[in-house]
Structure formats: structure tokens, C-alpha cells
């Protein structure tokens, strides 16, 4: 296009003889050549994109989808790269074995601690942090060890499927011999007020590349963006080790709502100013320009980006309730709050991870006469 413009400008400028028909033909020739070049570039980029997608599917044991994607391409029968990768998928698929669902374990974490000096500073929260939290360094070591031992991330939705009539059927997880499927989750990804200043991330955000990262407030009050908690840490690990994820699975985030979600103050109390706890009052006093609707919009964008990358959300009850001890009516009221103020941001969910591990039933399972069920 630049060359075409220069030639056209030369004709219009005059100063010498330049036959119009020759100028037109030259302009058309250069334009056509440019279009052909653009077309080749587009084709090359498209081919690379397809190969990248199919290769990732191959690395994450999703062989059927990789083959399907490759064979959908018009030039599949003449593209050696496509055919070779499809053949590799067929061979790998033939070696898969079904993993016993009853042997799948669940590993969960709370918010990770980055600055141990601030978390374990001897105040009243230090003991609890030490008992139930994990540091960033510990998490990285745990995940590396699990990867080295052959663990692979799966979802509960791989273990069971919901039929059209509402009944459930067993899923089937097919992995290479020696791989060990497991489910990973993180509780309370709300970045509660009580954790402020204790060396943990403050929220999840989208960086300049649209990737999900953490906002982190340093000890001196400056703000950094990076991998300071489980979500971006695991995202980065899986980019480097794609075979740690089965079919692109990540983890499940068990969400409350009373302090908002993902570090955004999205509960309705922050908008109405009603029934505020002391830490919520302090937040609003410290942030007089707080925009509730903007926080809801920002949280929704982050949640959408996370779901697109394989993350899933579960209810942890809106108020972190002990489902064993609380009445069915309390749980119903709590669930309505979750549906009203959390689901519009995160989306609906068919999973609950009980706060405190407090179930609504016992070892014998649920029954229809259980009002909580």
C-alpha cells in the first residue's frame, strides 16, 4: 500500500511524462502483489494458530478435539504438519487408560502468603495463618513435586456429568499410564479486609496483556502487579508445563460474598451502606471515591477472563456458614444472597465446597427428607 501510494503521488505531481495506462497497470500490479503477500501471511498465521491450538490439546491429552480441529481445515489432506500431528494424537490416544474415579484426591489451599515477615508478625492472626495458610514458596515447591510425580489437574465435571433429565452419570477420565488425576481448589478468594497489610495479594486484576494477575501492596505502600497468589502462579506453571492440565483444566475457586469477590467490594452492603461491619466501614471511609458499579464491572471482567482460561467457581456459601450447624432456613437465605450478589459476577455454579468442611449430611449420604438437601 505504501508503494502504491508513492507511485500514484508521482503521477499526480507531474514534472515529467508518465503514461496514465502504464501508471494504472503498475498500480494494479503492485496492489495485487501486496494482496497476494497479505494472503500468504494470513494463511501462515492461521496455520500457526491452528497448529498451536492442536499442539496444546495434544499436550493436555485432548486428542479427539485436536484431531477434530486439524481435520476441519480445508488443506488437511495436503498439510504434512496437520497430518503428522493428527497421527501422533491417534497413537497417543491408543495408550490411554481409564483412571479410577474413587482414587482421585482433592488438594486445596487458602490465600497464599508472600511476605512472611508481615504475616507472622506476632499479632493475633499469626497463629491462624501458620495453621491454615501456605506461603508462595511452599506452594511452588508443592506443585513442582506433584508435577514430577505425575499428577494432572482434572475437574469434578470430568468425574460426573449431568444428564438432560437431571440425573447424573459417572464420567470417564482417560490418561497415560502413570498419571495421577487430582482436583485442586482454593477457598475464600475474596481477599478479606482482615488480611490487609499481612503480606498477601489484595485482588485479582487484568494486566496490560489481558492476563489475570494479582495486585499486591508492598510494605512501603507501593503497588505491584504479578504472580502473588494461586491463580496466576498456576497459570504461569501450566504455560511452562501444559501437561499438568487435563483438557485445559485449572482449579475451582470456592467463593463467599460478604466482603465481595476477587478483591472487589461487590456485596450490596458497600452500595447501600446498610449492615456494615467495622472493617467495611473503615474501607468506605478510607476510599471516599469508591465506585460500587465499577467494582462489579471490573470483577466481572476478571471472572470472565478466568473462566476462559479453564478456572471454575463454586459456592462457599455467601457468609462462610457452617452448614452442619445452621438451619435449613439460614442456608436458604444465605444461598439467595449468593445468587443475588455473587452469581451475576461469577456466573451460576453447580458446585459447593462447604465452609469449615461442614457437610449437610453424614457418611451415609444425602436423603430427600433432609431439608438442607
Task: Give, region by region, the residue ranges found by the protein language model.
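Sec-dependent N-terminal signal peptides of Gram-positive bacterial secreted proteins and lipoproteins
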Residues: 1-23
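N-terminal, intrinsically disordered, polar/charged segments of Gram-positive cell-envelope systems
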Residues: 21-95, 102
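N-terminal pre-catalytic segment of deacetylase/amide-hydrolase enzymes
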Residues: 32, 84-182, 191-211
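Metal-dependent polysaccharide deacetylase catalytic core of the NodB/CE4 family, i.e.
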Residues: 102, 107-117, 167-168, 175-182, ...
Amino acid at each position: 500500500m505504501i508503494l502504491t501510494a508513492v507511485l500514484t503521488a508521482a503521477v499526480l505531481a507531474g514534472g515529467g511524462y508518465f503514461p496514465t495506462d502504464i501508471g494504472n497497470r503498475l498500480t494494479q500490479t503492485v496492489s495485487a502483489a501486496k494482496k497476494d503477500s497479505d494472503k500468504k501471511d494470513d494463511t501462515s498465521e492461521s496455520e500457526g494458530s491452528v497448529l498451536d491450538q492442536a499442539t496444546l490439546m495434544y499436550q493436555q491429552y485432548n486428542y479427539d478435539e485436536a484431531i477434530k480441529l486439524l481435520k476441519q481445515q480445508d488443506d488437511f489432506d495436503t498439510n504434512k504438519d496437520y497430518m503428522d500431528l493428527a497421527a501422533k494424537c491417534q497413537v497417543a490416544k491408543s495408550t490411554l487408560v481409564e483412571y479410577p474415579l474413587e482414587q482421585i484426591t482433592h488438594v486445596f489451599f487458602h490465600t497464599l502468603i508472600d511476605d512472611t515477615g508481615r504475616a507472622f508478625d506476632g499479632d493475633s492472626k499469626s497463629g491462624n495463618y501458620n495453621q491454615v495458610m501456605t506461603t508462595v514458596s511452599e506452594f511452588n515447591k508443592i506443585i513442582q513435586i506433584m508435577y514430577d510425580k505425575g499428577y494432572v489437574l482434572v475437574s469434578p465435571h470430568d468425574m460426573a456429568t449431568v444428564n438432560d433429565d437431571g440425573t447424573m452419570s459417572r464420567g470417564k477420565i482417560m490418561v497415560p499410564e502413570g498419571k495421577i488425576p487430582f482436583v485442586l481448589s482454593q477457598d475464600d478468594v475474596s481477599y478479606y479486609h482482615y488480611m490487609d497489610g499481612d503480606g498477601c495479594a489484595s485482588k485479582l486484576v487484568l494486566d496490560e496483556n489481558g492476563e489475570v494477575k494479582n495486585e499486591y501492596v508492598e510494605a512501603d505502600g507501593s503497588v505491584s502487579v504479578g504472580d502473588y497468589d494461586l491463580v496466576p502462579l498456576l497459570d504461569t506453571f501450566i504455560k511452562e508445563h501444559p501437561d499438568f492440565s487435563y483438557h485445559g483444566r485449572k482449579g475451582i475457586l470456592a467463593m463467599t460474598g460478604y466482603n465481595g469477590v476477587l478483591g472487589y467490594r461487590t456485596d450490596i452492603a458497600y452500595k447501600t451502606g446498610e449492615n456494615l461491619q467495622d472493617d467495611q466501614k473503615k474501607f468506605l471511609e478510607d476510599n471516599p471515591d469508591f465506585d460500587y458499579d465499577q467494582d462489579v464491572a471490573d470483577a466481572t471482567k476478571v471472572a470472565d477472563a478466568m473462566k476462559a482460561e479453564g478456572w471454575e467457581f463454586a459456592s462457599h456459601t455467601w457468609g462462610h456458614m457452617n452448614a452442619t450447624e445452621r438451619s435449613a432456613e439460614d442456608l436458604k437465605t444465605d444461598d439467595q444472597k449468593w445468587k443475588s450478589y455473587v452469581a451475576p459476577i461469577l456466573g451460576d455454579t453447580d458446585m459447593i465446597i462447604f465452609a469449615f468442611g461442614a457437610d449437610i449430611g453424614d457418611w451415609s449420604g444425602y436423603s430427600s427428607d433432609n431439608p438442607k438437601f
